[in-house]
Amino acid sequence: PAIIVLIHDGERALLGRQAAWPAGRYSTIAGFVEPGESLEDAVVREVHEETGVVVDAVEYHSSQPWPFPSSLMLGFLAHAATTDIRLTDAELEEARWVTREQLAAGEIGVPFEHSISFRLIEEWYDADARRPLREEPNVNRWGSGRT
């Protein structure tokens, strides 16, 4: 299985971008669970390996079948115990903290609506009873440009 996690410090969410993705497109942090590792430990390890951030309060959110490589993606939310980003892994070209306002303004490209990554971002975005992310008119959608 693989884990995918939305890391937040309350006011900001940590999103990453791979070099192969178009500029401005970001997603949540993900990685594979190692043999003998709990899902929660995989979240802590992957986040630290890829971003240098330490997380706590790891909470299961939902899952989604993942066609590559025929796996199951298990989604989590986690609180950032530290916020300094150090890209320690070649998987990400960039990682950055983003605000709800940046998402609403369309400054950050997000994944497709049906992806687990989008659902995790939306869960955090809507945590304080704001309008759901999918209804924001200027949000830049992953792969579809500005709406």
Per-region residue spans from a language model:
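N-terminal strand-loop-strand
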Residues: 1-28, 32, 54-57, 78-80
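Generic structural motif
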Residues: 10, 81-83, 100-103
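Surface-exposed, flexible loop/turn segments at secondary-structure boundaries
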Residues: 13, 21, 66-68, 103
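Nudix hydrolase/Nudix homology domain
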Residues: 22-26, 88-147
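The catalytic Nudix box helix
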Residues: 28-62, 76, 84
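Active-site-adjacent beta-strand/loop module that shapes the phosphate/pyrophosphate-binding cleft
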Residues: 64-89
